Amino acid sequence: MTTSHILGFPRVGAKRELKFAQERYWRKELAEQDLLDLAKALREKNWKHQAAANADFVAVGDFTFYDHILDLQVATGAIPARFGFDSQNLTLDQYFQLARGNKDQFAIEMTKWFDTNYHYLVPEFQKSTAFKANPAHYVNQIREAKALGLNFKPVIVGPLTFLWLGKEKGEAFNRFDLLNQLVPVYVEILNALVAEGAEWIQIDEPALALDLPAEWVEAYKSVYAELSKVNAKLLLATYFGSVAEHAELLKALPVAGLHLDLVRAPEQLAAFEDYSKVLSAGVIEGRNIWRANLNKVLDVLEPLKAKLGERLWIAPSCSLLHTPFDLEVEVQLKEKNTALYSWLSFTLQKVEELNVLKQALNNGRASVQAALDASQAAADARATSKEIHRPEVAERLANLPKGADQRKSPFAERIVKQNAWLNLPLLPTTNIGSFPQTTEIRHARASFKKGELSLADYEAAMKKEIEYVVRRQEELDLDVLVHGEAERNDMVEYFGELLDGFAFTKFGWVQSYGSRCVKPPVIYGDVTRPEPMTVRWSQYAQSLTNRVMKGMLTGPVTILQWSFVRNDIPRSTVCKQIGVALSDEVLDLEAAGIKVIQIDEPAIREGLPLKRADWDAYLQWAGEAFRLSSMGVQDDTQIHTHMCYSEFNDILPAIAALDADVITIETSRSDMELLTAFADFKYPNDIGPGVYDIHSPRVPTAAEVEHLLRKALNVIPKERLWVNPDCGLKTRGWTETIDQLKVMVDVTKKLRAELA
């Protein structure tokens, strides 16, 4: 019989129950025991869903109050020493302080979990880090599952991935040197799981899909030689990419089974066809929302079953953490777009798809014919739907003139034409885009969406807010103004709602980090722009002032990265479609007299593939899509872009190739370190490094802003330097915003006078 299992499950609950409970707990509106009880009930529901879908094991230990890598820091005694907490006796309050900071210590740094939109808390390793086992997190969840009479499989991230994901702090050393101290602690944790009756233990090593240094790869041999001494069968789980290059190493490891992601990297199966142990085939997409074509999946699985027999296991490609909970609650979507609804599959539907595959493998396809027919019908309808496939979109992309993504003239010529009409002072000041989204703005938007506020009244409220933003900027004496984006709920959702080819769910939430969830748009069809999206708002804002008003758009790569993307054509094609659609908006803005236009790309680095060999291809099409979004503009129209905090050093040629006239970047928290790379590279165009951190309500001192600006002037010619905050001001309050911007403008004027 074929075994089916789940690698991990969403934690937040079908209706984000955990999020709301956490936030009430943080506001001291919910007792700790009530939060613990709610979490226990959520775990039980998750396990019962898995059991109801006929999974042979339920995943245990994957549930977390904030982040599974933070749980591992606690379990191994590796929490940051700077907090002064005892990892063996950590309270729930202290656990949350690690994640959120307290009055004495900033929070543990967060970063993206591989190339997903989930964020983990980055372990801080020191030369003196002393690991100590505390398996309570896993043991307690095992006991709950046992009490329910469920067959369970603990899930834990492996030691090499855990160490790889961390950072060295304090005295210089290599965290790899900690491995020998970490492994015995892992053995102790695994033994505690065995003592609770664990027969199989899933150890996740997604780092194997990265470009690991040779010594790290080699270490898998000795590490797993030690771990395999525990009295349980180990399933080594890999995902997010191919591990074929390590096939010989992995086949020789003393583990009882291996999980492969056959959705992201189906071609790697060939390298493991002679594997002699359990092979877990990850065949249901764990990080996108499309229904599988089950007949096609069975075409792959049936020959495997013939070869492996009971050694074949089936599973989703990775944890289902990255997919929304239940499609069935999307009643509005079903009514509005029945076809699209039939092409989707959320977590509960995915475990059912897995169950159908299991029945087909064990009892033949005829035993689940109705389910297979429904799956095939959905796949066939999707392949031919006129709602998805618009010939005019493909034709437009195919017939773009050669060099469509290139500006008419080089930057050196464009900037002369731009400066002639802009007539800006040295060190021009501007904002990144958004201004505070007040309670009044949110209330007006909610009332309008509920039908309690008419369109005319809603637009009047937004115009009033835009005028307020313009007047404040004039009073502050900023040079290039923005309209503040009062009318936008979210920088991607706003455009998705106005572009064809996008759809939205009501409950399609996925965890981004901690209690923060996001509801990504669904790109299901060819993308077009039926009518102008931002022009009238920017025109209205410009009508209020004689100063230059900047148009604001979200770029194609960011829209792609922060959406659930169709999987029937290449991502590169989808991205270029978005770029071309945005170009229509850019030309309309230009025609309306808006001749400074910002196209935000905060997510361009996030899209980098896990393996460096694939970077060039990605950067090539991402850059082309960005440039297509401003194709056809005149030389005297100034294109800006903004990028959030990033390591740019290794992709600077690609950033320069975007050929934006002005790039603004988030640099204040790194003390302008990023700028050195731009200077060394001799970045050719204008640049606006952020001079204060908008993530904090704190008002910077004049000395701090001056220090950063002087550092910037040391490496960027004064003629090419702009002055701006790090990011948009959406999450700030008005009082601190005015105070912060005043400091920025005053310091700029002081330096201007000095440089004149």
UniProtKB/Swiss-Prot annotation:
It comes from Haemophilus influenzae (strain PittEE). 5-methyltetrahydropteroyltri-L-glutamate binds at R16, E17, L18, K19, K112, R516, C517, W562, E606. The gene is metE. Binds 1 zinc ion per subunit. L-homocysteine binds at I432, G433, S434, E485, D600. Signal peptide: none annotated. Its EC number is 2.1.1.14. Catalyzes the transfer of a methyl group from 5-methyltetrahydrofolate to homocysteine resulting in methionine formation. This is 5-methyltetrahydropteroyltriglutamate--homocysteine methyltransferase.
